[in-house]
């Protein structure tokens, strides 16, 4: 009989009783699937028997992020560009392993605290010293404020996805878009615990982006890297820039850039048509966050440490 061991609730720090299950233990894809729960906190534990492999799942997905960061999160998730994925995106936002939750908390804090531009500059992602105005931020293709520029960018992104014959219900939604107006645009592909995706060279999606103007990349080398999400974002950021400076950033843990994963990423990068106005950059979480944590509120520093973004 499968035995799921007892755990400690990450919120109230009280025990969650272990469970013996008759038969095969189901995979938990939402709170209601969890056989071990802290009902008062609304936190369930995935049905992994190995304590080290457990993912905690919140009944209310917003419970997975600090109270101070929750304003606007539901609205942004509801506007994510990939319509078909919205429901599962919101549900997975409540997982302790959620990449989207990390993306929201980090970038909204940097924006709301007025540190977004400075953090990008200190991470070496912005070189333009004349750039001073607060940029426009979109997460998952959704504007995070009511400004007209965000809606304009979202509308243009929809047009580009349609022109590439993407499914209207499954448009590409870059993790992060930072628009600097006449100074250019930046896409950020965020990785938390996972590596970059690995698609085979015969994957059906490649032809959609392979011949997109104005790209002059070595597409066969791009395909051999398997970095499909990055390739799609490179195509879209170049098209969205419309002659302005364009930057694609791969943001993640430092291990993303070493070993076999790093070699695969380097294969992708060397196949791109980069120049002074079309850049690819790598950034570790520590590059983005370390400089500003000394003055950060306690809730934000704790979140970054608990999620392993910084040591």
PLM features: residue spans?
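Phosphate/oxyanion-binding active-site loops and adjacent basic polyanion-contact surfaces
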Residues: 98-102, 169, 222-230
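Acidic, metal/cofactor-coordinating or nucleic-acid-engaging core segments within structured domains
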Residues: 197-251
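Active-site metal-binding core of divalent-cation-utilizing nuclease and nuclease-like domains
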Residues: 20-23, 129-183
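Non-catalytic C-terminal interaction segments of nucleic acid-processing enzymes
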Residues: 1, 231-311
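Nuclease-adjacent, charged terminal/linker segments that flank catalytic cores
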Residues: 1-142
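Active-site beta-strand-loop-beta-strand hairpin of nuclease catalytic cores
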Residues: 178-187, 195, 238-244
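A short acidic (Asp/Glu
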Residues: 107, 118-119, 198-200, 257-267
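Short, flexible loop/turn elements at secondary-structure junctions
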Residues: 42, 108-110, 178-182, 191-194, ...
């Amino acid at each position: 009989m499968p035995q799921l061991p007892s755990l400690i609730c990450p919120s109230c720090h009280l025990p969650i009783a272990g469970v013996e299950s008759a038969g095969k233990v189901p995979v938990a894809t939402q709170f209601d699937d969890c056989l071990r729960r802290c009902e008062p906190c609304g936190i369930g534990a995935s049905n992994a028997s190995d304590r080290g492999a457990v993912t905690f799942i919140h009944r209310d997905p917003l419970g997975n992020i600090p109270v101070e960061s929750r304003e606007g999160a539901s609205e942004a998730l509801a506007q994510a560009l990939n319509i078909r994925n919205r429901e599962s995106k919101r549900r997975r936002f409540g997982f302790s392993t959620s990449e989207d939750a990390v993306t929201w908390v980090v970038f909204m804090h940097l924006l709301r605290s007025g540190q977004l531009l400075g953090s990008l500059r200190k991470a070496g992602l912005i070189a333009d010293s004349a750039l001073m105005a607060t940029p426009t931020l979109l997460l998952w293709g959704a504007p995070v404020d009511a400004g007209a520029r965000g809606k304009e960018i979202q509308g243009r992104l929809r047009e580009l996805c349609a022109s590439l014959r993407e499914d209207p219900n499954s448009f590409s939604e870059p993790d992060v878009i930072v628009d600097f107006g006449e100074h250019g645009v930046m896409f950020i592909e965020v990785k938390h615990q996972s590596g970059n995706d690995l698609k085979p060279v015969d994957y059906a999606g490649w032809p959609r982006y392979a011949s997109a103007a104005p790209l002059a990349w070595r597409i066969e080398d791009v395909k051999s890297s398997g970095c499909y999400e990055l390739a799609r974002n490179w195509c879209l950021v170049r098209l969205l820039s419309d002659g302005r400076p364009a930057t694609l950033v791969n943001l993640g843990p430092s291990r993303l850039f070493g070993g076999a994963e790093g070699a695969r990423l380097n294969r992708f990068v060397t196949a791109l048509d980069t120049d002074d106005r079309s850049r690819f950059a790598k950034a570790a979480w520590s590059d983005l966050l370390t400089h500003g944590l000394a003055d950060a509120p306690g809730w934000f520093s704790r979140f970054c440490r608990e999620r392993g973004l910084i040591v």
